[in-house]
Amino acid sequence: MAGRGKAIGAGAAKKATSRSSKGGLQFPVGRIARFLKAGKYAERVGAGAPVYLAAVLEYLAAEVLELAGNAARDNKKTRIVPRHIQLAVRNDEELTKLLGGATIASGGVMPNIHQHLLPKKAGSSKASHADDDDN
């Protein structure tokens, strides 16, 4: 029976490598593949689809976390809280468009004062009174 089965003295079985590590990702490709199959989004799921989706999700998470970290640092804090995520998302035009309908729990609101409620500037009000006196 030479040539069949495992050779005697052959090395141990090759160690399994995850699809996440093959793709250089931190997000779980296998779990995303399982969710895609269980979700019945399509009858079949290609091999590259969960890898691509994991890469996209990882990129978006990294982008939001980077901006939230900057917001936390601007507020002299070392821990990111939901308020920092809210500020990061709402100050970025593309993320606001993507997450416009999403509500971030404990995120608060964006600081905004309507222009009509702000006090009038002293220099501009004198100029407008001078124009009124000419008529």
Swiss-Prot record:
Primary location: nucleus
Domain of life per record: Eukaryota
Q: Which UniProt keywords apply?
A: Chromosome, DNA-binding, Nucleosome core, Nucleus
InterPro entries the UniProt entry points to: Histone-fold (IPR009072), Histone_H2A (IPR002119), Histone_H2A/H2B/H3 (IPR007125), Histone_H2A_C (IPR032454)
Drop me one GO molecular function for this one: protein heterodimerization activity
Listed CDD domains: HFD_H2A (cd00074)
List, alphabetically, the GO terms of the cellular component aspect.
nucleosome; nucleus
Where does the UniProt annotation locate this protein? Nucleus; Chromosome
Pfam families (UniProt xref): Histone, Histone_H2A_C
Q: Which Gene3D superfamilies match?
A: Histone, subunit A
Query: Is ATP-binding found in the keyword set?
Result: no
Provide the function of this protein: Core component of nucleosome. Nucleosomes wrap and compact DNA into chromatin, limiting DNA accessibility to the cellular machineries which require DNA as a template. Histones thereby play a central role in transcription regulation, DNA repair, DNA replication and chromosomal stability. DNA accessibility is regulated via a complex set of post-translational modifications of histones, also called histone code, and nucleosome remodeling.
* Quaternary state and interactors: The nucleosome is a histone octamer containing two molecules each of H2A, H2B, H3 and H4 assembled in one H3-H4 heterotetramer and two H2A-H2B heterodimers. The octamer wraps approximately 147 bp of DNA.
Give the protein family.
Belongs to the histone H2A family.
Q: What name has this protein been given in UniProt?
A: Probable histone H2A.8
